[in-house]
Amino acid sequence: MAQPTPHAGLQEGLIHEPASEHGGGFPPFQSTTFAAQILWLAIAFGLLYYLMSRVAVPRIAGLLHDRQARLAADLDEASRMKTGADSARGAYERSLKEAQDKAKGIAQATRDSLAAEAETRRKALEADLAAKLAESEAQIRARTATAMGSVREVAADAATAIVERLIGQSPDRAAVEAAYDRTQTVH
């Protein structure tokens, strides 16, 4: 082995050996070893090819097949679930529409019954008011007749008193009432 000799410009402690001591260059480029290198390359490639084709590729193919099968099953399940969800949504929308229609029918029936009830009450109230009005008018006519009868007597008494005071003698009651009746028919 060669003794390390320091060279100028190199750091201390580095060993420099000339290329002639290495044995002739980079081994893969030596022409004497090409045949052995090609043989080992073929053996390594063949072994690697055998391992890949018998071990790795079947495992990868199995994984891909399993993944594809799982995806297909998941897609089928999703399709079934979508179909079920669509039918459930359709049933929900139909039942909602039926419930809305039923609610509208109930509301209309309630409005109709309340309107009929209000109309019945209105007619009963109108009939009651008409009866009370007729009764009141009858009472007014009776009271008017009574009052008019009283007015007739009061007027006759007043006319008799006035005539008696003016002429000094009392007029005939029948004549005073007849005069009053004539004045009432004129108006």
Curated annotation (Swiss-Prot):
Q: Which GO terms describe its cellular component?
A: plasma membrane; proton-transporting ATP synthase complex
Q: Which Pfam family is one of those matched by this entry?
A: ATP-synt_B
Keywords of this entry: ATP synthesis, Cell inner membrane, Cell membrane, CF(0), Hydrogen ion transport, Ion transport, Membrane, Transmembrane, Transmembrane helix, Transport
Its predominant location is: membrane
Q: Recall the GO molecular function terms of this protein's record.
A: proton-transporting ATP synthase activity, rotational mechanism; proton-transporting ATPase activity, rotational mechanism
Q: Which domain of life is it from?
A: Bacteria
Q: Which InterPro entries match?
A: ATP_synth_b/b'su_bac/chlpt (IPR002146), ATP_synthase_B_chain (IPR050059)
The record describes its membrane topology as:
Single-pass membrane protein
CDD domains assigned: ATP-synt_Fo_b
Q: List membrane-spanning regions.
A: 32-52
Q: Where in the cell is it found?
A: Cell inner membrane
Known function: F(1)F(0) ATP synthase produces ATP from ADP in the presence of a proton or sodium gradient. F-type ATPases consist of two structural domains, F(1) containing the extramembraneous catalytic core and F(0) containing the membrane proton channel, linked together by a central stalk and a peripheral stalk. During catalysis, ATP synthesis in the catalytic domain of F(1) is coupled via a rotary mechanism of the central stalk subunits to proton translocation.
The entry describes its oligomerization and partners as: F-type ATPases have 2 components, F(1) - the catalytic core - and F(0) - the membrane proton channel. F(1) has five subunits: alpha(3), beta(3), gamma(1), delta(1), epsilon(1). F(0) has three main subunits: a(1), b(2) and c(10-14). The alpha and beta chains form an alternating ring which encloses part of the gamma chain. F(1) is attached to F(0) by a central stalk formed by the gamma and epsilon chains, while a peripheral stalk is formed by the delta and b chains.
Q: What family does the database annotate?
A: Belongs to the ATPase B chain family.
Name the record gives this protein:
ATP synthase subunit b 2
Specify the species.
Methylobacterium sp. (strain 4-46)
Name of the gene this protein is made from: atpF2
